[in-house]
Amino acid sequence: MSKEKIAIAYSGGLDTSIMIKWLKDKYDAEIVAVTGNLGQQKEIENLESKAIATGASAFQFVDLRKEFVEEYIWKALKAGALYEDVYPLATALGRPLLAKAIVDAALAEGCTMLAHGCTGKGNDQVRFEVTFASLAPHLKVLAPLREWEFTSREAEIAYALEHNIPVSATKKSPYSIDENIWGISIECGVLEDPMVAPPEDAYQITTSPENAPDRPTVVDIEFVQGVPVSLDGKTMSGLELIMKLNETGAANGVGRLDMIENRVVGIKSREIYEAPAATILHFAHRELERLTLEKTVFQYKKNISQDYANIIYNGLWFSPMRHALDAFIEETQKPVTGLVRVKLYKGSLSLLGRTSPNSLYNEELATYTEADTFNHKAAAGFIHLYGLGLKTFSEVNPAR
């Protein structure tokens, strides 16, 4: 009788490395380790040999970067999705795609179970398991970190040494870090005190604003229907554009975010993020929308932006609601074509200009010069009708 197979999300870190051995023994199963490339800079070249040496029977490496940018990041950007008006959702966006890759591998390999290495206290367990349930409800889900016997990192290292599991964890960084091309999340250590300023060693890619260049950097970003397509006049792929903006923004100290956020599981947490490209692109995209969207659409879309951000953050990417909102968002983005010029300087963003063939700004109507074509006399009748309801109310209720 053949053994059952378990597909696991594998990063090569301490937790997922010992998870292979632990699951293999507990369930007498074969382990299929799956790693997705979402643009993280972390070493990924030797993961296959490490997974096999740890006890996996198979390994799948999936380059998800193009799909991540085109089907996840750009959707979130067009939606204006910033969780609680700050977080550009880098980790939250990556989880459903990674979970989808694990499901695909599990189905291809004939697995009967899925496993992840998330703790029982965070958001990611929700994102993985809700996605698993959405895409493969017939597969059993395992969460070893919620049930295994290890109560400390030291205990995990001891287990690894006992079973000759190759891990490099000998000195722990004080921070927990997750990274993909859209941003980096940093937590734990001294960051758990919300009154402690983040030490410089917490930041992974951004230059301290104080040490950033004394001369500003100016970038021109061109959008077509809400999607960035060129940088400084050079057409490039979404992946290349994000990588370049990450580099340029980081060098200028742009993209450092510090927030107290409300987790899915009901607690508040202090999070530090680095997201240079995301910060710049959200800023530029919003300014282009101000120029091209009709007033009521622009104002109403802000509500949709928050709803969309909540859907992503709460792990509901594959929900009918997200698909329904996409239809509205795609309609709003049809006129969002044009160029935005942004100045980057010592951690700050400044808008220098914007232009669009679909601009709703009419200089002849807006000007106060002799070129003015606005009918000033029409304002009297408009104001009379606009305030008529309140005038009538006050006449009936004089005491108010």
From Swiss-Prot:
UniProt-annotated location(s): Cytoplasm
Origin: domain of life: Bacteria
Keyword match Ligase: yes
Main location: cytoplasm
A biological process term (GO) from this entry: argininosuccinate metabolic process
Keywords: Amino-acid biosynthesis, Arginine biosynthesis, ATP-binding, Cytoplasm, Ligase, Nucleotide-binding
Keyword Nucleotide-binding: yes
Positions bound to L-citrulline: Y87, N123, R127, S176, S185, E261, Y273
Gene Ontology CC annotation, any one: cytoplasm
Pathway: Amino-acid biosynthesis; L-arginine biosynthesis; L-arginine from L-ornithine and carbamoyl phosphate: step 2/3
Known EC number: 6.3.4.5
Residue sites binding ATP per the record: A9, Y10, S11, G12, G13, L14, D15, T16, S17, G117
Reaction(s) catalysed by this chain's protein: L-citrulline + L-aspartate + ATP = 2-(N(omega)-L-arginino)succinate + AMP + diphosphate + H(+)
GO MF entries: argininosuccinate synthase activity; ATP binding
Amino-acid positions noted as binding L-aspartate in the UniProt annotation, renumbered to this chain: T119, N123, D124
Assigned protein family: Belongs to the argininosuccinate synthase family. Type 1 subfamily.
NCBIfam families reported in the protein's UniProt record: argG, PRK00509.1
Subunit relationships: Homotetramer.
Protein name: Argininosuccinate synthase
Species this chain originates from: Chlorobium phaeobacteroides (strain DSM 266 / SMG 266 / 2430)
Lineage of producing organism: Bacteria, Pseudomonadati, Chlorobiota, Chlorobiia, Chlorobiales
